Curated annotation (Swiss-Prot):
Signal peptide, first to last residue: none
Job description of the protein: Substrate-specific adapter for the anaphase promoting complex/cyclosome (APC/C) E3 ubiquitin-protein ligase complex. Associates with the APC/C in late mitosis, in replacement of CDC20, and activates the APC/C during anaphase and telophase. The APC/C remains active in degrading substrates to ensure that positive regulators of the cell cycle do not accumulate prematurely. At the G1/S transition FZR1 is phosphorylated, leading to its dissociation from the APC/C.
Name the record gives this protein: Fizzy-related protein homolog
Species for this entry: Mus musculus (Mouse)
Sequence positions bearing Phosphothreonine: 32
A GO BP annotation: anaphase-promoting complex-dependent catabolic process
């Protein structure tokens, strides 16, 4: 073996052992003669440290957070949603641009950055680069500062500072209004609250139906079924907001003119209480404890336009028409979620994944064919379905009974109300299923939910005999950058 190569090899072994095992290195020093060539210092190392000046730093920073975060990191990510946290993220991105040349132009949301940031297309370079690129960078590439620029930071940092800042989402955890609702029943299978398109709230209390105007705060009693020996089990407004349907304990469905306070008709056909109602233009669908779903056109005699849908083996407690009025979703106490169309008397789709009664049903107004459903105490899950293909999509365990679901009209979010054992109201972001807000205040199961016609407020009802109004959703505002006289980059100062 070549002596020079042997000396270099032995020198590397000794250096490695000195860094790992100090006692062994001391022993080697005592055993090595002073005139040995091993002890002579090296003037030129044979290890090369690669230069990473051309690395994709946005991907490298993303790789740091790929592992599971610790509780302290999760707490920091939660704090990052505040104003101070967002300022810290912007400052951190600015430092990465100026010190490391990261080229970040937009501050990412800490809750969605790890989900959506994907590595960009890699550049065609060698695995290791041992010298800087000889190509001269121009001021237009964004990383260098032009000699004629008045800003002390690079072009990429200027774009970062000019990027529009998304306003902080703040949802009040205190209801803006609370109304007393005496005799509001604590029954999971009933639907006693609905909000009309004319901004009038209908509530079934015992044997009566009351109307509350959100514009004038005036309360009127629409009907009293005590004379008939009956009670209210469901209410539902028509799409135009002029008619309200009232389901009764004896199985009748009454149609009332809300403005005139006059009963227009009484529909028969059910043999048990009617707990679910759903309008589709002039057609009214009703679900009952007799396991039957009846569809009737209120403009014609009942027997001429009646359709009987049989598919559930227990009480029907949830009914919702799709936003395009083509499909009807029904949930029952048999843990089934069925989907019907206009042309068939049998369900076109059947989902049996829930482990408890399915009362909470909601069709997405943002994605065609997307259906959400929630299960009772033994299930506690919110499930999402693609009714176009019949495939299940996502599922999340909420930890408590799911009583109601409603999609936001303005954003891809939905709200859920819960019973045993949390009695809470949750706001979710879809499809990430991250929790946006948690509202508490009811002491009983939050069994009833309705949304205002403008889509910004919701009302919840519970067995604690209260109705609580919450500002949950907000209309989308313009993200156009505001031109201010104080803007550093649009005015000469």
């Amino acid at each position: 073996m070549d002596q020079d190569y042997e000396r270099r090899l032995l020198r590397q072994i000794i250096i490695q052992n000195e860094n790992t095992v100090p006692c062994v290195s001391e022993m080697r020093r005592t055993l090595t003669p002073a005139n040995s060539p091993v002890s002579s210092p090296s003037k030129h190392g044979d290890r090369f440290i690669p230069s990473r000046a051309g690395a994709n730093w946005s991907v490298n920073f993303h790789r740091i957070n790929e592992n599971e975060k610790s509780p302290s990191q999760n707490r920091k990510a939660k704090d990052a949603t505040s104003d101070n946290g967002k300022d810290g993220l912007a400052y951190s991105a600015l430092l990465k641009n100026e010190l490391l040349g990261a080229g970040i132009e937009k501050v990412q949301d800490p809750q969605t950055e790890d989900r959506r940031l994907q590595p960009s297309t890699p550049e065609h370079k060698g695995l290791f680069t041992y010298s800087l690129s000889s190509k001269r960078s121009s001021p237009d590439d964004g990383n260098d500062v032009s000699p004629y620029s008045l800003s002390p930071v690079s072009n990429k940092s200027q774009k970062l500072l000019r990027s529009p800042r998304k306003p902080t989402r703040k949802i009040s955890k205190i209801p803006f209004k609370v109304l007393d609702a005496p005799e509001l029943q604590d029954d999971f299978y009933l639907n006693l609250v609905d909000w009309s398109s004319l901004n009038v709230l209908s509530v079934g209390l015992g044997t009566c139906v009351y109307l509350w105007s959100a514009c004038t705060s005036q309360v009127t009693r629409l009907c009293d079924l005590s004379v008939e020996g009956d009670s209210v089990t469901s209410v539902g407004w028509s799409e135009r907001g002029n008619l309200v349907a009232v389901g009764t304990h004896k199985g009748f469905v009454q149609i009332w003119d809300a403005a005139a306070g006059k009963k227009l008709s009484m529909l028969e056909g059910h043999t048990a209480r009617v707990g679910a109602l759903a309008w589709n233009a002039d057609q009214l669908s009703s679900g009952s404890r007799d396991r039957m779903i009846l569809q009737r056109d209120i403009r014609t005699p009942p027997l001429q336009s009646e359709r009987r849908l049989q598919g559930h083996r227990q009480e029907v407690c949830g009914l919702k028409w799709s936003t395009d009025h083509q499909l009807l979703a029904s949930g029952g106490n048999d843990n089934k979620l069925l989907v019907w169309n206009h042309s068939s008397l049998s369900p076109v789709q059947q989902y049996t994944e829930h482990l408890a009664a399915v009362k909470a049903i909601a069709w997405s107004p943002h994605q065609h064919g997307l259906l959400a459903s929630g299960g009772g105490t033994a299930d506690r899950c919110i499930r999402f379905w693609n009714t176009l293909t019949g495939q299940p999509l996502q599922c999340i365990d909420t930890g408590s009974q799911v009583c109601n679901l409603a999609w936001s009209k303005h954003a891809n979010e939905l709200v859920s109300t819960h019973g045993y054992s949390q009695n809470q109201i949750l706001v979710w972001k879809y499809p990430s299923l991250t929790q946006v807000a948690k509202l508490t205040g009811h002491s009983y199961r939050v069994l009833y939910l309705a949304m205002s016609p403008d889509g910004e407020a919701i009302v919840t009802g519970a067995g604690d005999e209260t109705l609580r109004f919450w500002n949950v959703f907000s209309k989308t505002r313009s993200t156009k950058e505001s031109v201010s006289v104080l803007n550093l980059f649009t005015r000469i100062r």
